[in-house]
């Protein structure tokens, strides 16, 4: 993304996040935008909206389909983008808003990489440890099964990693033996 595009994204995302936080609607807005993000990822809608061959009317029509959200703030954001002809920036703005809300609230999705799936009890026991060690709040847990870890688990959130896997421990031993 070039500087001009980034400035446009910031122009819409920063004030929107500020309003969301002032109205204490960060959970609802985050949930709505996460659902929209999922739809965009499944359908490659961002490519459609940024395609030069698609008319503004078509882009507006597609974005208006998302105005059925429960959140008035999200509906208003979509309306402002349509009125200003910025439909092609909706997806980058959405991503930036999600990042800013996470950063401001310090609530993140945590990804747990493990050989086997964790039980609900194990997840419940891990949440306080994760929150304390990583100094953040857990919004949700995403599991990723990875047989290459051999045993243990690795946790990632907000660009931080806790790795207790046997694979990492074996690498550490290998490095010491060199």
UniProtKB/Swiss-Prot annotation:
Superkingdom classification of source: Bacteria
Keywords noted in UniProt: ATP synthesis, Cell membrane, CF(1), Hydrogen ion transport, Ion transport, Membrane, Transport
InterPro entries per UniProt: ATP_synth_OSCP/delta_N_sf, ATPase_OSCP/dsu
Subcellular location: Cell membrane
GO cellular component, one term: proton-transporting ATP synthase complex
Membrane-topology annotation of the record: Peripheral membrane protein
Pfam families with a match to the protein in the record: OSCP
MF (Gene Ontology): proton-transporting ATP synthase activity, rotational mechanism
Residue ranges of coiled coil: none
UniProt entry tagged with the keyword Membrane: yes
Main location: membrane
Keyword Transport included in the entry's annotation: yes
Subunit (UniProt): F-type ATPases have 2 components, F(1) - the catalytic core - and F(0) - the membrane proton channel. F(1) has five subunits: alpha(3), beta(3), gamma(1), delta(1), epsilon(1). F(0) has three main subunits: a(1), b(2) and c(10-14). The alpha and beta chains form an alternating ring which encloses part of the gamma chain. F(1) is attached to F(0) by a central stalk formed by the gamma and epsilon chains, while a peripheral stalk is formed by the delta and b chains.
NCBIfam families: ATP_synt_delta (TIGR01145), PRK05758.2-1 (NF004401)
Record function comment: F(1)F(0) ATP synthase produces ATP from ADP in the presence of a proton or sodium gradient. F-type ATPases consist of two structural domains, F(1) containing the extramembraneous catalytic core and F(0) containing the membrane proton channel, linked together by a central stalk and a peripheral stalk. During catalysis, ATP synthesis in the catalytic domain of F(1) is coupled via a rotary mechanism of the central stalk subunits to proton translocation.
Family: Belongs to the ATPase delta chain family.
Protein name: ATP synthase subunit delta
Organism: Streptococcus gordonii (strain Challis / ATCC 35105 / BCRC 15272 / CH1 / DL1 / V288)
């Amino acid at each position: 993304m070039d500087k001009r595009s980034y400035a446009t994204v910031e122009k819409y995302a920063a004030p929107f996040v500020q309003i969301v936080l002032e109205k204490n609607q960060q959970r609802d807005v985050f949930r709505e935008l996460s659902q929209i993000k999922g739809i965009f990822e499944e359908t490659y809608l961002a490519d459609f909206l940024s395609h030069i061959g698609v008319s503004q009317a078509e882009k507006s029509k597609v974005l208006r389909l998302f105005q059925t959200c429960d959140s008035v703030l999200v509906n208003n954001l979509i309306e402002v983008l349509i009125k200003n002809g910025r439909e092609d920036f909706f997806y980058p703005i959405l991503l930036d808003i999600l990042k800013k809300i996470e950063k401001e609230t310090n609530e993140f999705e945590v990804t747990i990489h493990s050989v086997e799936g964790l039980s609900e009890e194990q997840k419940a026991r891990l949440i306080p440890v994760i929150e304390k060690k990583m100094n953040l709040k857990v919004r949700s847990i995403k599991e990723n099964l990875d047989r290459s870890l051999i045993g243990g688990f690795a946790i990632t959130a907000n660009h931080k990693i806790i790795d207790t896997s046997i694979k990492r421990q074996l690498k550490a031993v290998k490095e010491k033996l060199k």
